[in-house]
C-alpha cells in the first residue's frame, strides 16, 4: 500500500470516541473479511517483530478469551516467564500485569481476546522491556467489525521506548469494509499528530500497511515456509543471545582483523553460539554442561565461535586449513585451541575393518594419493605421492579421531559439510557451499519431488537434502532448525542419536565412499586449501 491508497484522516473525528484521534484509513473498501484480519493480527500480537526489527520477541504473560454474548471468560492462561538477570537491562513497569482498558464509543463492542505481553527488544541495554495490553474486540451488532487495541503499561510519554509509537493507545479498526488506525495521544501531544512528517504519524501509516498486507496474505492463503524454534526453545535461545551479545560483541567488532563485514560475522556467530549452548544443555543436561562434552569446530574460519564457546567455559578446538588474522586478537587460552591443520578423515587412511580383523597390527591401508605441483623451479608440473602412513603421522593433518564425548560443529564448513555426519560423533552442520566427498564442487538435486516443490530445488536446498540423506543412511536421527541468523543459508542439521555410534566406521560409510568414487580427490583438494585464500561467507 502507498500514500495513494491510504487517506490521512486527522481532520476527521474518530469513530472510537473523543479521546481518540483518527490517523489513516484505506481509500477503498478492503477485500478481506474479519476472520482474515483477526488471524493476521493475532499473529502480529504474538510476533511484534513483524512491526519493528528492533523487537526481539513478545512473551505472552496473560492470554484470556471471552464469550461475546455473556462476557464470561472461557479460557485463561497465565505464564511466569523469567527475564535474563544481566545487569543493565532496562525495564519499565514489568511487574504491572493487570490488563488495561481504554474508553471506546463504538456501539456494542466487547472483548473477545485479552492479552498482556512483555515486549523484549533486541538490545534491552538500550531499549526498555515493557508490558502491553492487547485487546481484540468484536461488535455484537455488526458481525464484520473487529478492533485491535494496544495499551502500554505506563502513563508517561517519557517512559515510551523507541520501538512503539509514543501514544497512550493504538487502535486498528476493521469497520464497514474500511481499515483504519487511531491513537489516544498522551497529554499535551495531540498537536504532533497533525504533522505527517512526525515519526509517530509515520508509524501509524506503517502499522496500517502491515495490518492490510498480512490480512490480505491470510485471505490469499499465504503459508509460512520456514518454521523456527523447532529444536531449541526460542526464549532460552534469545535470552542467551542477549547475554552473549552484551558480553562479546563490542570487543569482537572493535578488534576485527578481517576484510569482511564484522557485524555480519560477529552477530551471526554469537547467535550460533547461543543456539549451541542451549542445544548442549538440552542434550547433556543443564547442570555442569561444560564438563560433560567437548567440541571440535571443523573449518572454524575466523575463530569467533570458538572464542565465545571457550570463554563460556566449554572445552574444544577449532581446526582450519588456514590461520586467520583474527586469531591474533584472542587471549592465549583461545589461541592454543585454534589449529592450522587439514582434515583428512581416518576412514581414508586406516585399514578396512575386515582387513584389520585379519591383520590387527596394521595402522594404515597402504593407499597413495597423488597431488600435482606447479612451481617456477620445476621444468614441468610434478606429481607428489602422499602415503596414508605419512599422512597419519603429519602434524599438519587432523584425521578426525576425537574423544567419545566430542560434538562436531560444521559452521559453513564448505568441503567438510557432507563429511561431518560420517565421522561418528554427534554434530550440528550448517551447510553453505556444495561439495562432494572428494572436495569437488557439485550440485545435488532435492530427492523428493513434492519436497522440491515446497522448498525449491536450489543448489542450497539440494545440499541440505544431501546432508540429511547421508546422515540418515549412517543411522543418525536428525532434526533441522532454521537458525535465527543474518544469513539466507541458515539451515542447521543436527544429529546426536545413533544406535550404531559404537560401530563407526560402518559398512554403510564404505558403501557411500565407493558410490562417490572412493573420495580419491579429497587429499589433493584439501591440501590445496592450505595454499588458497580464505573465503568470506
Swiss-Prot record:
It is found in: Cytoplasm. One of its GO terms (biological process) is tRNA methylation. The keyword Plastid does not apply. Keywords: Cytoplasm, Methyltransferase, S-adenosyl-L-methionine, Transferase, tRNA processing. Its EC number is 2.1.1.211. One of its GO terms (molecular function) is tRNA(Ser) (uridine(44)-2'-O-)-methyltransferase activity. The keyword Chaperone does not apply. One of its GO terms (cellular component) is cytoplasm. InterPro entries: tRNA_uracil_MeTrfase. It catalyses: uridine(44) in tRNA(Ser) + S-adenosyl-L-methionine = 2'-O-methyluridine(44) in tRNA(Ser) + S-adenosyl-L-homocysteine + H(+). Probable adenosyl-L-methionine (AdoMet)-dependent tRNA (uracil-O(2)-)-methyltransferase. Belongs to the TRM44 family. This is tRNA (uracil-O(2)-)-methyltransferase. It comes from Kluyveromyces lactis (strain ATCC 8585 / CBS 2359 / DSM 70799 / NBRC 1267 / NRRL Y-1140 / WM37). The lineage of its organism: Eukaryota, Fungi, Dikarya, Ascomycota, Saccharomycotina.
